[in-house]
Amino acid sequence: MNNRVHQGHLARKRFGQNFLNDQFVIDSIVSAINPQKGQAMVEIGPGLAALTEPVGERLDQLTVIELDRDLAARLQTHPFLGPKLTIYQQDAMTMNFGELSEKIGQPLRVFGNLPYNISTPLMFHLFSYTDAIADMHFMLQKEVVNRLVAGPNSKAYGRLSVMAQYYCQVIPVLEVPPSAFTPPPKVDSAVVRLVPHTTMPYPVKDIRVLSRITTEAFNQRRKTIRNSLGNLFSVEVLTELGIDPALRAENISVAQYCQMANYLSENAPSKES
């Protein structure tokens, strides 16, 4: 038997499809999401409706975004879900979640078992719409969840950690073994809750500057920041900001990265003479 076939659908590698089939895990995720009637629930990648059905049972209306044409068609003709669904057959990376929130008339509650091959870029795409999002619940590769929640001075801490924690409170929910899927992925999975900050703990004047600093620092994470960020900050400026120039990217806190970004937004890049 082909273990890539589930409910008559062949899982497509190019879409990173792994279908959730463990009822205990499904119930645990739906309980964590706790969908309520009247909320603007949006599912990314509903697949074979493992989460769509139990969530949809609690709602009068549900928006889903599904790239796979065949799966979108199955949902359209679903016996009890069909009439409740608004289906966008497109790549979630091209979705304007701000416009969707305006159309529905309230902040979105986004959830999904995300394809692991696009999970990180999709997270960054969603971060740009946090003003339009109430919360997010995602099944991700466990390693990605570890990176999302990681703090400074750990190997998992990186650009994704900084940017996620800048935008959101990040809360791990549960771990999921490969056996909960068809076909089983080669990695462990985990569910995470992301709640956009209503008041930013570390306000930044220009998010593009924070993005640039974290990219440059973590692209050379083994270098000290006096070297990796030497084109942006002099040793004197780092010292003035209370940041040791001998630290590496993984030693700098989210608050310190935001402090550096605000300095750079207000001052032209300076170098040690």
From Swiss-Prot:
E.C. number(s) listed in UniProt: 2.1.1.182
Subcellular location: Cytoplasm
Primary subcellular site in the record, as a coarse category: cytoplasm
Binding site for S-adenosyl-L-methionine: N18, L20, G45, E66, D91, N113
GO cellular component, as recorded: cytosol
SUPFAM superfamilies linked: S-adenosyl-L-methionine-dependent methyltransferases
This protein's UniProt keywords: Cytoplasm, Methyltransferase, RNA-binding, rRNA processing, S-adenosyl-L-methionine, Transferase
Reactions it catalyzes: adenosine(1518)/adenosine(1519) in 16S rRNA + 4 S-adenosyl-L-methionine = N(6)-dimethyladenosine(1518)/N(6)-dimethyladenosine(1519) in 16S rRNA + 4 S-adenosyl-L-homocysteine + 4 H(+)
PANTHER family, alphabetized: DIMETHYLADENOSINE TRANSFERASE, DIMETHYLADENOSINE TRANSFERASE-RELATED
Role, per record: Specifically dimethylates two adjacent adenosines (A1518 and A1519) in the loop of a conserved hairpin near the 3'-end of 16S rRNA in the 30S particle. May play a critical role in biogenesis of 30S subunits.
Stated family: Belongs to the class I-like SAM-binding methyltransferase superfamily. rRNA adenine N(6)-methyltransferase family. RsmA subfamily.
Record's protein name: Ribosomal RNA small subunit methyltransferase A
